[in-house]
Amino acid sequence: SSSAASDVYKRQEATTEAAVDRFHSLAGELRDTEAALSHTSQLMGAVVKYAKTRPVFDGYKAARYSKKYLAQHEAELSDYRAAKAAMSELLDGAKLPKMDALKKRRRELSEKKKALYAEYRKAQADMREAVAVKGNIDFLRGYPDGREDKAQER
């Protein structure tokens, strides 16, 4: 009977480990998806700001970089430079995708995040349950931290 109990315990240990691994794996995937979503949204924001301020910059160029024009449009030109720098940093040498492609990517990432989050919550509940069950078994078996060889380790 002790061997049957030992098998049950080993199965519970494996179940717990798998539940913990799944939770951590989903947490990582969720983090990566959120980072990609944030990156895409930032890039879209920079593209919009760039498009809005580009005509002002073109006007500045056409005015041969006149101090008077600069003084009249300082805020827009500053926004233009900031948007251009943000795009350059976010793209990191890559080609700028079309706005439609960015919108599609943001939509897909948003849906993926939603689905992942639901899986993540379930995995979290499964993990908590498995850890609690294992903890109860450990307690009943008299292993405060789930280790039989604790005394030998010291």
Give names to the regions the model predicted.
Residues 12:
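Extended, highly charged clamp/arch subdomains and adjacent linkers
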Residues 5-9:
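Short, small-residue-biased leader/transition segments that mark boundaries at the very start
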Residues 121-154:
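Coiled-coil termination/hinge junctions
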Residues 29-40, 85-88, 92-95, 99-127:
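Amphipathic alpha-helical coiled-coil segments
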Residues 16:
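Conserved phosphate/pyrophosphate-binding and hydrolysis machinery centered on Walker-type P-loop NTPases
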